[in-house]
């Protein structure tokens, strides 16, 4: 007996479940990692829901204290659904991208693959940051103040993340802190450093949000 094929106008339930699952167990994370490696960390596929967290400190961190997939709070009450380890190739790609394309131009340079030098530039960054705050604040009016994703929301986002990046930062040298920071907190601390200060990149992990 032959059966005719039936074309469903929607995905079968298991596919939808996999796409929507928020906090997978260890096995699910391994499967996710495998898929990412096979696709050579396809930027188009993962740029929306995945990004990276960098451990950057003023002293070189022992590998036992590297940021890893279990360091941060994840799941409920956390920005991160889950975190995962990455391979060396992906790690270096994102370190290069951070220094060359994300951080303020000229403020940092490579000394080695996992060491960067702060060259100065805090005064200029502070001036630019304040000017941007004032410009964005001008868009807040009595008429726009209650807009759902309006100028108030955009200003709040900018104050936390002036680099407008999905990268997060972890500056604890002992690996005890259970949360990461957005780009404002990283730059705020950098502005306290003397030009020439060396910064060391420890653990770099993937996160899903």
Indicate residue ranges for each PLM-predicted region.
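Aromatic (phenylalanine/tyrosine) cluster motif
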Residues: 3, 10-13, 41, 46
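Acidic, proline/glycine-rich low-complexity IDRs
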Residues: 48-49, 169-209
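Low-complexity, serine/threonine/proline-enriched polar segments
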Residues: 74-173
